[in-house]
Swiss-Prot record:
Gene3D superfamilies attached to this UniProt entry: Aldolase class I
Function of the protein: Involved in the gluconeogenesis. Catalyzes stereospecifically the conversion of dihydroxyacetone phosphate (DHAP) to D-glyceraldehyde-3-phosphate (G3P).
Subunit details: Homodimer.
Keyword Isomerase tagged: yes
Protein name in the entry: Triosephosphate isomerase
Principal localisation: cytoplasm
A GO CC term assigned to this protein in UniProt: cytosol
Positions contributing to substrate binding: N8, F9, K10, G165, S197
Location in the cell: Cytoplasm
Similarity comment: family membership: Belongs to the triosephosphate isomerase family.
Gene: tpiA
Residues annotated as catalytic: H90 (electrophile), E159 (proton acceptor)
One biological process term in Gene Ontology: glycolytic process
Recorded GO MF terms: triose-phosphate isomerase activity
Organism of derivation: Helicobacter pylori (strain G27)
């Protein structure tokens, strides 16, 4: 399976820097990168999607066409920008924005019906990991119960919460074991990405694991040169 690199800007990128980054990345890449390189700016960092060398996605959207949902963007906003790729289930939205499993199920179903490409994020907390691998498997299995694992436009990103933003990536053995388990659950055509303190130093090694189909990258992608280096490892 072709390896993938995704950049999640979170809410860290200044608006005009984000715009400049997207335009410069478009100049750097080639058409064959379109299905292999994804960028998720925040809402103000999005641009009308005329990019041909990478896929532009949104970090979040409310599961309605439009309406009285103060502070949200909806499918109509994204479709107007020609954006049809969406992150769902990121741990920061689960924890900080209190997005429940039932709401994530609703969001997934809505955007599945719109035929969006969905990057669905899962991952366990350190307390679960410390209980042993059986507990991890049960937890991840529960996180996947609410979505259609045979959806053809699905990408799953495994991000252990204890590794996000901590500068402590999961060990290669942990990634190997966890991805091996998840591959048994997922449709064989569904890409499975790893995220969690990925950086220029460890990206190539993680990509070398057969069951890792790509990377979802946070802070290490915020500088374009770093992201370009990681893309070169694909």
């Amino acid at each position: 399976m072709t390896k993938i690199a995704m950049a999640n800007f979170k809410s860290a990128m200044p608006v005009f820097k984000s715009h400049a980054y997207l335009k410069e990345l478009e100049k750097t890449l080639k058409p064959q990168h379109f299905d292999r390189v994804f960028v998720f700016p925040d809402f103000l960092g999005l641009l009308p999607n005329s990019f041909l060398h990478f896929t532009l996605g949104a970090q979040n959207a409310y599961p309605r066409d439009c309406g009285a949902f103060t502070g949200e963007i909806t499918s109509k906003h994204l479709e107007e920008l020609k954006i049809h790729t969406l992150l769902i289930g990121h741990s920061e939205r689960r924890a900080l924005l209190k997005e429940s499993p039932s709401f994530l199920k609703e969001k997934f179903g809505f955007f599945k019906d719109k035929n969006f490409k969905i990057v669905y994020c899962i991952g366990e907390e350190l307390t679960t990991r410390e209980k042993g691998f059986r507990a991890v498997k049960e937890f991840l299995n529960e996180q996947l119960e609410n979505i259609d694992l045979n959806y053809s436009n699905l990408i799953v990103a495994y991000e252990p919460i204890w590794a996000i933003g901590t500068k402590k990536s999961a060990s290669l053995e942990d990634i190997y074991l966890t991805h091996g388990f998840l591959k048994q659950i997922l449709n064989q055509k569904t890409p499975l990405l790893y995220g969690g303190s990925v950086n220029v130093q460890n990206a190539k090694e993680i990509l070398g694991i057969d069951s890792v189909d790509g990377l979802l990258i946070g802070s290490a992608s915020w500088e374009l040169e770093n992201f370009k280096t990681i893309i070169s490892f694909l």
